[in-house]
Amino acid sequence: MARGDAPRDSYHLVGISFFILGLGTLLPWNFFITAIPYFQARLAGAGNSTARILSTNHTGPEDAFNFNNWVTLLSQLPLLLFTLLNSFLYQCVPETVRILGSLLAILLLFALTAALVKVDMSPGPFFSITMASVCFINSFSAVLQGSLFGQLGTMPSTYSTLFLSGQGLAGIFAALAMLLSMASGVDAETSALGYFITPCVGILMSIVCYLSLPHLKFARYYLANKSSQAQAQELETKAELLQSDENGIPSSPQKVALTLDLDLEKEPESEPDEPQKPGKPSVFTVFQKIWLTALCLVLVFTVTLSVFPAITAMVTSSTSPGKWSQFFNPICCFLLFNIMDWLGRSLTSYFLWPDEDSRLLPLLVCLRFLFVPLFMLCHVPQRSRLPILFPQDAYFITFMLLFAVSNGYLVSLTMCLAPRQVLPHEREVAGALMTFFLALGLSCGASLSFLFKALL
């Protein structure tokens, strides 16, 4: 595909569209976990009285439903499932149906979540409806992201960067929306309703952006040239892009420029190598080359999802009740995590250390397991076994800074190193494997969160 023949992206409309699509894909997950106090208060029997739901640093008196854990697990299991089913779906369901259908389904399910703010119901049915919504929303999100990654694989890598930038802002956007809801001064029920309507508006904008792409000459040029190799490229691009997405954690746009080696400028070179295509690389051979890097990726996400947000969302301020104690968790847990994780991912734009041959990488990854007891020993009032050894707010903030930066950097580093450990024709298989291990790490972490919470 000759890049010189491509039309210009007038007013950067295609870039803006993919940025908004990136933002829309991760808004649901981020808005659910950031609103944990709201859900836990409803499940604790607060009914429809939201007067103290969004205005206090309250995580539920007992959290008998283990909402933190279940919302994390039921968000990540669909990712693992659809990672395995993606190749089947891509062959059987047209791309437009996958993308537009997923967006509409997410919109309707989130509208249901917003409507429930006004509905008074007992905790049991509310929990069941919410968990079903979480599961279905994240199933559709997994299909949506995989399909959009396929489209991005046919376009210049700049648009992958813009897409990831949008996804990277989703967590920050959700945290800011929560803070604005709490500080708005309106009654709490209206505040909660406005909070949950916000992602609906984001999804609507995503639908408009997707529908506008066929009407933009620049998008038509690249998407019309989608060849039979697009599905293979989709898997490879997806693995490199997914370094940030499925757990709602932001990504560095600079990092993508490093990892997306298959730019469109290099695509023409792959076509003359068509005779090599019958020699499909062995999955086992590729796994032997990247197994340590893949294991590191699994362990990084296992540690992160085992305590975030299941444990970290339960940490409260040790100061006397006031404005700071109300805003402590949204700021120090969610906003701080998303910002520092993004900065951690950005570091790989400037250096990649340790390299793929170093044994220091597994050591650094294993050291992150120390964060599990550190967070468990912070100021979590709802506990029956472990003592509180780090009651001051400064401890939690320091741990969160290091936790978030290390997560962002090590995830970005492992996803960057994996393609360098295999031959060019093996990258498709390596990409599919890394995508699977990413989803596996998220699911393992979400499952372990039940154990760690029980040990508190």
UniProtKB/Swiss-Prot annotation:
This is Equilibrative nucleoside transporter 2. One of its GO terms (cellular component) is basolateral plasma membrane. Pfam families: Nucleoside_tran. The chain crosses the membrane at residues 13-33, 70-90, 99-119, 124-144, 162-182, 193-213, 291-311, 324-344, 360-380, 386-406, 432-452. Bidirectional uniporter involved in the facilitative transport of nucleosides and nucleobases, and contributes to maintaining their cellular homeostasis. Functions as a Na(+)-independent, passive transporter. Involved in the transport of nucleosides such as inosine, adenosine, uridine, thymidine, cytidine and guanosine. Also able to transport purine nucleobases (hypoxanthine, adenine, guanine) and pyrimidine nucleobases (thymine, uracil). Involved in nucleoside transport at basolateral membrane of kidney cells, allowing liver absorption of nucleoside metabolites. The modification Phosphoserine is found at S252. The gene is SLC29A2. It is found in: Apical cell membrane; Basolateral cell membrane. Keywords: Cell membrane, Glycoprotein, Membrane, Phosphoprotein, Transmembrane, Transmembrane helix, Transport. It comes from Homo sapiens (Human). Changing D5Y: Decreased nucleoside and nucleobase transport. Glycans are attached at N48, N57, N225. It catalyses: inosine(in) = inosine(out); adenosine(in) = adenosine(out); uridine(out) = uridine(in); thymidine(in) = thymidine(out). Changing L455R: Reduces drastically localization at the cell surface. No effect on uptake of adenosine and thymidine. Reduces drastically localization at the cell surface and induces an significant reduction of adenosine or thymidine uptake. Glycosylated. Its main location: membrane. Belongs to the SLC29A/ENT transporter (TC 2.A.57) family. Changing N68K: No change in nucleoside and nucleobase transport. Changing N48D: No difference in uridine or cytidine uptake. No differences in Km values and lower Vmax values for either uridine or cytidine uptake. Transport activity is insensitive to nanomolar concentrations of the inhibitor nitrobenzylmercaptopurine riboside (NBMPR). Inhibited by higher concentrations of NBMPR (1uM-10uM). GO terms for molecular function: adenine transmembrane transporter activity; cytidine transmembrane transporter activity; guanine transmembrane transporter activity; neurotransmitter transmembrane transporter activity; nucleobase transmembrane transporter activity; nucleoside transmembrane transporter activity; purine nucleoside transmembrane transporter activity; uracil transmembrane transporter activity. GO terms for biological process: adenine transport; adenosine transport; cytidine transport; guanine transmembrane transport; guanine transport; hypoxanthine transport; inosine transport; neurotransmitter transport.
